A protein has these predicted regions:
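Cysteine-rich micro-motifs
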Residues: 21-33
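Short capping segments at the starts of secondary-structure elements
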Residues: 52-57
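A short acidic, leucine-rich amphipathic alpha-helix
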Residues: 60-62
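Short cysteine-rich clusters marking metal-coordination/redox-active sites
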Residues: 8-11, 26
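Short, flexible, mixed-charge glycine/proline-rich loop motifs
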Residues: 1-4, 16-20
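A short, conserved structural fragment
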Residues: 80-91
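Short amphipathic alpha-helical interaction segments
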Residues: 67-78
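Short metal-binding segments enriched for Cys and/or His
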Residues: 30-45
Length: 105
């Protein structure tokens, strides 16, 4: 995996260029969404409550809630790459087919 400082702070994708001087984001969409702190916390808490200690596919989890897929997968990437609350089974970029679970403490 890449270093955390080379990823977008909203969606967790690898940065190829920076769009903002204030935030580390990959697109103008992420730049506008990263300012919505309450929405980010709400989506993150929903994602954490959906997960368990067994492996689950991102696509299956996203079908259980009514959240935009981009925001849902972005939340999962933030929780894997930055917060270390979730973990991914594979060491590749997280997508809809990736398997994730909660980190055992």
């Amino acid at each position: 995996m890449t270093k955390n400082n080379s990823r977008c702070k909203y969606c967790g994708r690898i940065l190829y260029r920076e769009v903002s001087e204030k935030y580390i984001v990959c697109s103008s969409k992420c730049k506008s969404l990263i300012k919505k702190f309450d929405y980010i916390r709400k989506v993150d808490s929903i994602v954490i409550n959906l997960n368990s200690y067994k492996w689950s596919a991102v696509e299956d989890l996203s079908k259980k809630v009514d959240i935009n897929k981009f925001d849902f997968i972005s939340s999962i990437r933030r929780l894997v790459y930055f917060e270390n609350i979730l973990k991914a089974k594979e060491r590749k970029e997280i997508n809809q087919k990736s398997l994730i679970s909660i980190v055992k403490k």
